[in-house]
Amino acid sequence: MLIIPNRENLEQCVAFAKKHGLGFEYNDFFAPSLLDDAKRLEEVIQLYRQSGVPEYCTVHGAFFDVIPCSVDEKVKEISIQRIEASIEVAKRIGAKAVVFHTNYNPFLNSKEYVDKWVENNISFWSSELEKHSDIQIYLENMFDTTPDILEALSKSLCKYPNYGVCFDYAHAVISPTAPELWAKQLGRFVKHVHINDNDLVSDLHLAWGNGKINRKDFYALYEAYMPDASILIETSCIEDSKESFEQMKQEGFLTE
């Protein structure tokens, strides 16, 4: 189980993580402004290293407008720079994995476009997985309306031992496809899961139990299809992380 550390109350985050044996997923480094400020970037990396990096941690990579297979060469160039920078940060901080979004646009859905998109992304991510075989690279469903694209990618990329799917359950819930179908199609590829709550309409990142997601359904699907995957409580403040953690304990999903 992982939580998101917050620099504003880092000591509290570290204490809570140590008390319960939790890891961290660092969310600072997807910000373009930080990646572009070498001095500030180094300060943040050192802050986390000095605070005590948990034994298991991950980094959320850059995702704003990151399209590594764009037909626009300039967009492609900066996207690849962002991805490489994210991986470098993850390695420097001692993370076991780095998470990226598919960033697939579901409105471009002609067969020709989809086939080319899958082909190009398989080629790109295969290269990244080979180049960075010393770190896990996870692809997360974001704008995806079905698991089909991510499943197609995963069928080819799963031959790399450092590849996995990051299954964002809240994103799946607000998609037009039932969460059970997501779990069935992607389960065998899932190594990491993001959870938080919402109103079944928007991606609100509420504390677990403060929205309308059917939590029992999640527990059942997790146990059935991805029981070995790590889980991130993807909420932005330590209070919501604690509340979510306690909710899962009360419902018997977590034991200490």
Q: What residue spans do the PLM features occupy?
A:
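Acidic-and-aromatic substrate-binding clefts and catalytic sites of carbohydrate-active enzymes
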Residues: 2-12, 28-43, 67-69, 106-108, ...
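Active-site acidic/histidine proton-transfer and metal-coordination neighborhood
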Residues: 69-164
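Alpha-helix-loop-beta-strand connector modules within alpha/beta enzyme cores
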Residues: 44-64, 119-132, 215-222, 227
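Charged helix-capping and loop-helix junction motifs
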Residues: 38-43, 75-83, 114-122, 151-152, ...
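Short, basic/glycine-rich phosphate-binding loops at helix/coil junctions
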Residues: 63-64, 99-107, 195-200
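Hydrophobic faces of well-ordered beta-strands that scaffold small-molecule active sites
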Residues: 1-5, 22-26, 55-60, 98-100, ...
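Histidine-acidic metal/acid-base catalytic patches
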Residues: 11-18, 96, 149-164, 172-256
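N-terminal pre-domain/capping segments
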Residues: 1-85, 255-256
